Curated annotation (Swiss-Prot):
Its EC number is 3.1.3.2. SUPFAM superfamilies: Phosphoglycerate mutase-like. This is Venom acid phosphatase Acph-1. The keyword Hydrolase applies. Pfam families: His_Phos_2 (PF00328). It comes from the Eukaryota. Disulfide bonds join C145-C355, C330-C334. The active site is at H26, E273. Belongs to the histidine acid phosphatase family. Glycans are attached at N182, N228, N366. It catalyses: a phosphate monoester + H2O = an alcohol + phosphate.
Amino acid sequence: MSVIAILAMVVGVQAELKQINVIFRHGDRIPDEKNEMYPKDPYLYYDFYPLERGELTNSGKMREYQLGQFLRERYGDFLGDIYTEESVSALSSFYDRTKMSLQLVLAALYPPNKLQQWNEDLNWQPIATKYLRRYEDNIFLPEDCLLFTIELDRVLESPRGKYEFSKYDKLKKKLEEWTGKNITTPWDYYYIYHTLVAEQSYGLTLPSWTNNIFPRGELFDATVFTYNITNSTPLLKKLYGGPLLRIFTKHMLDVVSGTQKKKRKIYLFSGHESNIASVLHALQLYYPHVPEYSSSIIMELHNIEGTHYVKIVYYLGIPSEARELQLPGCEVLCPLYKYLQLIENVIPSNEELICDKRFVDESANNLSIEELDFVKLNLIRIAGTENK
């Protein structure tokens, strides 16, 4: 612990919370048919009515609501009990499950104060949220971006990349027989794993071949390998976890410099487990695991007698408990200047944030002619523009 932090404890000076940034994973969901379902999946044609593929289950809805309750309990004194538009920013990816997860977190985080109660029978109030369309999203889904794809392909085609991937050849052969799916990239292991997670969470009985490889075992190892290889170079870290870190950091610096446009207290980002893993990788805090449903990285900005500190909290989701993480080379309560030094090499530049997904078939199909006409050649998401 730093000298200032120790002295603060000795003389009884309290750290003053100034801002909170949160990136969290959506809740439990139904398997997503586009990438995850495999030909021999016994639930390939299962009727999940009234749910559609990829949507939140009731368990997932409750888990996100509980995340909101956790945030309310931990930060209630700081946030206050009255919602104001300028106090919170809420952004999600374009998936329905992340949009709904964001609404559920907000419902628990900001139940209506008596002053704001508009229906005595409903302990809820509407709160504005925003989302990024897939073709403009290099925050939650940067793996679609051309520069990321080029760099990852370079890594996978390198001698080292081929060697690391070949370590799972025995698993590959067995999985192809069991699933009927051709395994050609690390993502294939990843998608099979997450299909099994979703089906198990829903209460479905998994095939017997999963017993020795899931949730721990070779398939888990191959999925962890996917997280590792997709964050294995400085550029991949910049492009994957870097955009969120850049946004978090700009938000904090705006507070410190007094240039914050609105008096934001909390920024909520509703995304995916890949966002949790990539931010942990960028911070050199990742350990072999698959981030659980509703897991969250929380970055707190504190002030102790004029000196600013950063604290990182990992809400595990399952179980619903939190851990304070210590950045390598710093303390749990890390001086802001030291934090800035530690993350300097994983913050992307404007040029590295350039991401045009118009030529990705899936994204292009979702655009109207008018939208295609107006999309700029280079889409640069400048961190912190939602403050304006």
